[in-house]
Amino acid sequence: MKDVKIMSLFRVLNESSTSCKDPIFGTMNYKHNWNKSETFTLLGKKYKLEVAVQAYNGKPINSEEQKSYKYIKENWPALQKPIARSLFKFAKECDQKVYTEKDLSKIVKPRIILFQLNGNAYLLFDCAWDLENDISVQIYPDIKLVNQQCFL
């Protein structure tokens, strides 16, 4: 009976420490970082992306991360074209034949929006022509192509 009480207490403590209701992000779960799934439209398609927020040892999401998430949510329609331009430019530099968003959506697939402690945010993509490295676009505070290796 004592073991059952201990296991119940552990389960309650474990469950309460692995999720939070952030006022900006909403309900988030913790496993190495705060995360949730969310649907975003990009390149004319809807994608279910992981929203990942860095945190150390389950510490709360900070104000810089909240600020960048709020900015991205409020400005997502305006951010899509510059993101697509960055991807087009990179694809053409890699000799990929892309002419439309539909072409681009066949060779890159967004997976994760990563929010770093300093508020920088990155959109990480799977990339058909470079499976080892993939690609990322910084989407806050600036939009630019970056090397995904720095996140691994």
Regions found by a protein language model. Give the residues of each.
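Acidic, proline/glycine-rich low-complexity IDRs
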Residues: 1-40, 46, 97-152
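Long, charged/polar, surface-exposed segments that mediate recognition or autoinhibition
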Residues: 52-102
